[in-house]
């Protein structure tokens, strides 16, 4: 389904509840890039609405539905549930040819803080993972650009990130190793977030 659509979000949650009776972990991983990389001054409202609708609005309201289900369930291993938002290094790095994506991921970062603040007292923890350059379908069209950046040393760990790198971070947050932290993020970006001279 499309998490940008209300009916699809409701269908997703009800089918999971029907199958398992509870939701212990929500990973908000759905996301899209602009169909066309356009200069900020040329970006269309349609592109902005599409990216924000899926990446930010979808996350906001799927989390709302899941959090309400988590509030109704007993604690398991000292918590009622864990919500993990996959944002991006683009939450704080400017990319003027895909501004709508940057805005959407900055919004996901704020959603992490908002839901962490609201749900901490209820035993629901909320975390954020900020991937860097990960080898996916989304980055396949710009391989040459990122290969060049990697070769030029933009990333201290000089390689493409892999889906497994993100999955490892998700597993760590989903487990019970971070029971005294919420509203936080981890950069899984090969050190790209380090400001270097």
Residue ranges and their predicted role:
Residues 37, 153, 171, 182-197:
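Short C-terminal tail/terminal secondary-structure segment
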Residues 37-40, 44-49, 151:
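Substrate-binding pocket helix/loop in short-chain dehydrogenase/reductase
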Residues 63, 104-107, 112:
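Active-site helix of classical SDR
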Residues 68, 72, 117-118, 179:
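Alpha-helical segment proximal to the catalytic Tyr-Lys
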Residues 88:
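Residue(s) in the substrate-gating loop at a strand-loop-helix junction
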Residues 120, 125, 181-183:
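Short, small/polar-rich loop/turn modules that mediate ligand/substrate recognition or access, typified
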Residues 155-166:
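A conserved structural motif in NAD(P)-dependent oxidoreductases
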């Amino acid at each position: 389904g499309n998490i940008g659509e209300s009916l699809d979000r409701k269908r997703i949650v009800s089918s999971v509840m029907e199958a398992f009776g509870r939701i212990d972990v929500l990973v908000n991983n759905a996301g899209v890039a602009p169909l066309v990389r356009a200069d900020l001054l040329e970006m269309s409202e349609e592109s902005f609405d599409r990216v924000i609708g899926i990446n930010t609005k979808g996350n906001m309201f799927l989390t709302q539905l899941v959090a309400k289900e988590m509030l109704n369930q007993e604690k398991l291993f000292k918590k009622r549930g864990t919500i993990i938002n996959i944002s991006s290094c683009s939450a704080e790095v400017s990319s003027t040819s895909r501004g709508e994506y940057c805005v959407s991921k900055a919004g996901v970062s704020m959603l992490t803080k908002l839901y962490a603040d609201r749900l901490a007292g209820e035993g629901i923890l909320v975390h954020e993972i900020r991937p860097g350059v990960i080898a996916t379908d989304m980055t396949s069209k710009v391989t040459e650009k990122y290969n060049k950046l990697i070769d030029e040393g933009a990333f201290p760990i000089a390689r493409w990130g892999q889906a497994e790198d993100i999955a490892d971070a998700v597993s760590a947050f989903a487990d019970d190793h971070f029971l005294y932290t919420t509203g936080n993020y981890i950069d899984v970006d090969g050190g790209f977030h380090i400001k270097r001279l």
